[in-house]
């Protein structure tokens, strides 16, 4: 399940969807499916981070992988890669892109990287941001309140915005609602909800 061997073929359009997925929610799935259809990607590759450079106190890798597996189950266009987890340490996007391009895809394949507009605001602070733009097409899912004028011109001219619906769901809000004993049903898939409940995550 956690592999990308099926992505090996000429002129395949692959889109990496990186994140902590703590937990993966309906917004993640709707964005991924819509982008897949709108951009005509052959595969959306979910890439859970081992240790994000800007986040702390995240759930165990095993829990996040299990929830993500439940979330995408049954969708032939979705796959999971544990590349960043196996690499260990802090997960940097540029390292992942270089690893994928050198080991898993052909020169003729097209590689894209999907991020939210909230992450786009921080892209200039990521490790080797110019190299990220050189190694893939950055596709941005716009979140409410986003203003293109907040993005440096050298980045803005080298990305493209996806034509997708905007959702007000976030993993952090889900964790807060759970701790406050508020429902998160319909914000995550039922198997993910059951996993969170059974394993007492976010308590």
Predicted regions, residues:
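Nucleotidyltransferase catalytic core that binds NTPs
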Residues: 2-203
């Amino acid at each position: 399940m956690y592999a990308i061997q099926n992505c090996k073929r000429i002129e395949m359009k692959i889109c990496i969807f990186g994140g902590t997925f703590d937990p993966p929610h309906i917004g993640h799935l709707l964005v991924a499916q819509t982008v897949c259809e709108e951009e005509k990607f052959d595969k959306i590759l979910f890439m859970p981070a081992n240790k994000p450079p800007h986040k702390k106190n995240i759930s165990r890798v095993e829990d996040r992988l299990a929830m993500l597996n439940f979330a995408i189950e049954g969708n032939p266009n979705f796959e999971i890669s544990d590349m960043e987890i196996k690499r260990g340490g802090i997960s940097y996007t540029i390292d992942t892109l270089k690893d994928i391009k050198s080991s898993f895809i052909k020169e003729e394949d097209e590689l894209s990287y999907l991020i939210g507009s909230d992450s786009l605001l921080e892209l200039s602070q990521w490790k080797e941001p110019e190299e990220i733009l050189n190694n893939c097409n950055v596709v941005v899912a716009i979140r409410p309140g986003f203003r293109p004028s907040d993005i440096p011109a050298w980045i803005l001219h080298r990305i493209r915005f996806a034509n997708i619906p905007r959702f007000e769901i976030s993993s952090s809000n889900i964790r807060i609602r759970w701790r406050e004993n508020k429902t998160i049903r319909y914000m995550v898939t039922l198997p993910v909800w059951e996993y969170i409940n059974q394993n007492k995550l976010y308590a």
